Swiss-Prot record:
This is Protein-glutamate methylesterase/protein-glutamine glutaminase. InterPro entries: CheB-like (IPR008248), CheB_C (IPR035909), CheY-like_superfamily (IPR011006), Sig_transdc_resp-reg_Me-estase (IPR000673), Sig_transdc_resp-reg_receiver (IPR001789). It is found in: Cytoplasm. It comes from Paraburkholderia xenovorans (strain LB400). SUPFAM superfamilies: CheY-like (SSF52172), Methylesterase CheB, C-terminal domain (SSF52738).
């Protein structure tokens, strides 16, 4: 078996050593070289032709983002960003994902062995996913206003008939590559779109920054979900990185419920948990969407939604960074429709428009 060749770039010798120990402890990957900064990394890439690059976000001599932007333009390759848990680190990491990084992982905690096994498994999974990922060159980030301004003259709006009922919902799940996929789904949505609930595999600390970033790009309001808050049209609610997000009911209203129950499919938040709660409480009033990601989280839950009467969509292979979760959902027969990412918003809103303003009681 040919091992995945990894190049680790970090200005800390201790972190480079720890990352090397973790990666070399896996049976299917090996560190071919390490670099203290991007300038050294540039030469090592030429020498070793690695399959995956792990890249520190903040480094001397050349900023990690500057290096990533040049790399994705001149020699695109799978990159996993390594980030500190700071507000600045969160913002830089999200920008790195926009520039074409496949995924990110937080820095290992030096000298703390508790949780190291779990960290090692997560790092290895992300490297495996990156090695199989479709690398894309960075594209300009489009704001909602720009999206509307560039619509063809006379083109039909995404959503012709405003939904007067709060009963309709859009339920979304994603993992690797999902931050950019979610952005592409949300930005075109009109202000009167139904509420959107989102489970994206992401560690604590990043989901709030992710929501704030999307809120600045979208015509709907995007926020990190809070326990017990009412789910409203024109809003998107992102599961916090430390909790499962579930849909619940209080009378005629939908409510966001957060749970600290153990991880499901090794994830918290879990897409399956969100989808199953939507199947139970929204039924045929929901549209379920499963986007790019590694593994099978969400596949069974999407099938539950379909069985409950929801319309379900899966992202197609060609537009996925990692065609894992959608593949599993399609294999289960959970997807009513397979759509490319650029068409996903239009397909979702077309389906909701066909549902009209009729309130369908579960």
């Amino acid at each position: 078996m040919q091992k995945i060749k990894v190049l680790c770039v970090d200005d800390s010798a201790l972190i480079r050593s720890l990352m090397t120990e973790i990666i070399n402890g896996q049976p299917d990957m090996t560190v071919v070289a390490t670099a203290p900064d991007p300038l050294v990394a540039r030469e090592l890439i030429k020498q070793h032709n690695p399959d995956v690059l792990t890249l520190d976000v903040e480094m001397p001599r050349m900023d990690g983002l500057d290096f990533l932007e040049k790399l994705m333009r001149l020699r695109p390759m799978p990159v996993v960003m390594v980030s500190s848990l700071t507000e600045r680190g969160n913002e830089i990491t999200l920008r790195a994902l926009e520039l074409g990084a496949v995924d990110f992982v937080t820095k290992p905690k030096v000298g703390i062995r508790d949780g190291m096994l779990d960290y090692s498994e997560k790092l290895a999974d992300k490297i495996r996913a990156a090695a199989r990922a479709r690398v894309r060159q960075s594209a300009p980030v489009q704001h909602a206003a720009a999206h509307a301004a560039h619509a063809p003259v006379g083109a039909a709006p995404l959503f012709n008939n405003p939904l007067l009922s709060t009963e309709k919902l859009i339920i979304v799940g994603a993992s690797t590559g999902g931050t950019e996929a979610i952005r592409e789904v949300l930005v075109p949505l009109p202000p009167d779109a139904p509420a959107v609930l989102i489970a994206q595999h992401m560690p604590p600390g990043f989901t709030k920054s992710f929501a704030q970033r999307l809120n600045g790009l979208c015509r709907i309001t995007v926020k990190e979900a809070e326990h017990g808050e009412r789910v409203l049209p024109g809003h998107a609610y992102i599961a916090p990185g430390h909790a499962h997000l579930l849909l619940a009911r209080s009378g005629a209203n939908y409510i966001a419920h957060l749970s600290d129950e153990p991880p499901v499919n090794r994830h918290r938040p879990s897409v399956d948990v969100l989808f199953r709660s939507a199947a139970q409480h929204a039924g045929k009033n929901a549209v379920g969407v499963i986007l790019t990601g590694m593994g099978r989280d969400g596949a069974a839950g999407l099938l539950d939604m379909k069985k409950a009467g929801a319309y379900t969509l899966a992202q197609d292979e060609a537009s996925c960074i990692v065609f894992g979760m959608p593949r599993e959902a399609i294999a289960l027969g959970a997807a009513d429709e397979i759509a490319s990412l650029p068409e996903m918003s239009r397909r979702v809103m077309a389906r909701l428009s066909s549902m009209g303003d009729r309130v369908q009681r579960v």
